[in-house]
């Protein structure tokens, strides 16, 4: 879908992921619009209990619009992550580190 504003056309297509990786219990995404976003694995119930090795098994599905962990049987949408829709709140220890 496009919105025309004067002579400019702005795309409203949500960005997809070009690649995904896990590092230090964070999941990172490189998006098609050039951004790199990351989130703590502990923001999702199944990922919270996963080992570091299991987290590293992340793969892209649906042309970069979904993340998949086969051994965990877990799928997460990239647009949901980009919009900040997580299952669990930030842990107190994370908030304390950021505030300090």
Q: Regions from the language model: what does each represent?
A:
Residues 1-100:
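Motif-centric detector for short Cys/His coordination patterns
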């Amino acid at each position: 879908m496009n919105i025309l504003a004067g002579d400019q056309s702005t795309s409203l297509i949500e960005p997809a992921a070009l690649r995904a990786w896990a590092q230090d219990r964070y999941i990172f995404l490189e998006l098609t619009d050039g951004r790199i976003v990351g989130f703590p694995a502990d923001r999702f119930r199944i990922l919270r209990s996963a080992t570091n090795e299991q987290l590293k098994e992340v793969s892209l599905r649906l042309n970069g619009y979904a993340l998949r962990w086969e051994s965990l049987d877990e799928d997460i949408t990239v647009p949901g992550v980009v919009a900040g829709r997580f299952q669990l709140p930030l842990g107190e220890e994370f908030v304390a580190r950021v505030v300090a």
